[in-house]
């Protein structure tokens, strides 16, 4: 059999002998929940003479690769934008057969119709197979999962069989349950072919099936930090057999605050392990983690060294105001849904916005579903399945799905709310244009996001994208201190209204209505402050004054159609007026805008006209 051979016969039955190091027949310990995850775990003081030695260098350079000159290697790396740092880095493989994987692995690769390794696979496989620690920095959708899974299979095949009570040989830590499940789906097919066992453990799902998998013994465990900490604390599994550690999307795990849990977990693993860290960015926090966990590692970077987006994505930025987003989204979805390939992810900032927007769109007949962290695992799995199979081609999501969500045919990404950082922006739009395909990303950028405008322009320029002139204007206004309106951009909607008739903005003159009040309901109430601090209220939709208007201590009722009552003006005189009085004074001795007496407007269907609040 070509490829890597080992003394492990996967066909023979596995007997349960005496437990080796790391195992116990005493059964699982009863555990309790703690406020500080992992505080029950004690850092192990490793004596490397105690556990058995293990082999981690299995790399056999293919003859075709050995004949390749240094100049040819450099030309290939330059063409694929591969940057390598570290000593004695192996040459990249240009074809699958040059990696010398076992025949059953090659059969699965052939069934999946892969033509050639991606850039991160070409350079990452020789490094991982050599037993070296490595850091891989590459954009989303670049094939990172197979970059560490296939060398893991080779590594496992050269280790002794698991005994009862042994933990996994390969541990993959992932930031979210969605990413963990996707890694498990990729691993499952290769594990079946190689007669290995894998499992996925994550929060939000029943513990029973996950515990049974661990007790039966698995070579590969894909886990989120929180659930793994739970199982380690109560003795459901252990990591003393773990010799191959993968930190997938390390930057995301740090963003989510998992660093203490990661350190607790790594303390349970023998220090002579092989460690592979994968990330889409290379901030100082990730660099520090690499320095702490990795030894003499090889750093592989795919693409530009600075923050960069996938160049296969067309990025379109629309500078607008918050109240315009809904209408713009509907117009955009009408165009997208007319396309044959129309699978779309809409990213929003909050869980509440996700639920509200999902309800609005479904109410108006759009095939949309929402996903965020507060939904149950069963509901999240169902929503993702419906989205993947095209039954609901519009997915509205918070950042819980912005990384690791691997759906091959996502054609469009819409940033309804701009994220908090350009790193998150790059990860969001990276849900499209997976595996060398193309895609389009639309972004609604408001003046409230002005702090991110410079970084966004840098990302657009690096990817050779057209830059909206309004973005450049925001930078100019911000730099010169000429910021106008809320958030630094002039509110040009006011120019569409003549003086005294800005019903969408002010009831009375702007300066004297500075501290007006608004309600958040569809029927907007405008308030004008009087001398004594009371407020009048005008219902925007039916043209009538509401009840209980108070001015200078006098309570007066205003009713639709024929308002009568008393009103005290700025000269402390009281006048009686009826329905035909043309000029009312507002307590500040200024002319009030006369609302037309119109019939009540019907409920406005979504999307709402620009004259109404959105």
Curated annotation (Swiss-Prot):
The modification N6-acetyllysine is found at residues 32-33, 40, 236. GO terms for biological process: alternative mRNA splicing, via spliceosome; androgen receptor signaling pathway; epithelial to mesenchymal transition; estrogen receptor signaling pathway; intrinsic apoptotic signaling pathway by p53 class mediator; miRNA transcription; myoblast differentiation; negative regulation of transcription by RNA polymerase II. A motif (Q motif) lies at residues 94-122. CDD domains: DEADc_DDX5 (cd18049), SF2_C_DEAD (cd18787). Pfam families: DEAD, Helicase_C, P68HR. InterPro entries: DEAD/DEAH_box_helicase_dom (IPR011545), Helicase_ATP-bd (IPR014001), Helicase_C-like (IPR001650), P-loop_NTPase (IPR027417), P68_rpt (IPR012587), RNA-helicase_DEAD-box_CS (IPR000629), RNA_helicase_DEAD_Q_motif (IPR014014). Signal peptide: none annotated. It is found in: Nucleus; Nucleus, Nucleolus; Cytoplasm. Residues 328-475 form the Helicase C-terminal domain. Sumoylated; sumoylation, promoted by PIAS1, promotes interaction with HDAC1 and transcriptional repression activity. Sumoylation also significantly increases stability, and reduces polyubiquitination. GO terms for molecular function: ATP binding; ATP hydrolysis activity; mRNA 3'-UTR binding; nuclear androgen receptor binding; promoter-specific chromatin binding; ribonucleoprotein complex binding; RNA helicase activity. It catalyses: ATP + H2O = ADP + phosphate + H(+). Residues 1-15, 488-498 have a biased composition (Basic and acidic residues). Residues 1-46, 477-504 are annotated as: Disordered. Its main location: nucleus. There is a cross-link at residue 53 (Glycyl lysine isopeptide (Lys-Gly) (interchain with G-Cter in SUMO)). The keyword Nucleotide-binding applies. There is a cross-link at residues 32, 45, 53, 340, 343, 388, 391, 411, 437, 451, 470, 523 (Glycyl lysine isopeptide (Lys-Gly) (interchain with G-Cter in SUMO2)). Identified in the spliceosome C complex. Component of a ribonucleoprotein complex containing mRNAs and RNA-binding proteins including DDX5, HNRNPH2 and SRSF1 as well as splicing regulator ARVCF. Interacts with RBM4; the interaction occurs in an RNA-independent manner. Interacts with AGO1 and AGO2. Interacts with ESR1, AR, EP300, CREBBP, POLR2A, TP53, RUNX2 and HDAC1. Self-associates. Interacts with DDX17. Interacts with BRDT. The large PER complex involved in the repression of transcriptional termination is composed of at least PER2, CDK9, DDX5, DHX9, NCBP1 and POLR2A (active). Belongs to the DEAD box helicase family. DDX5/DBP2 subfamily. This is Probable ATP-dependent RNA helicase DDX5. The gene is DDX5.
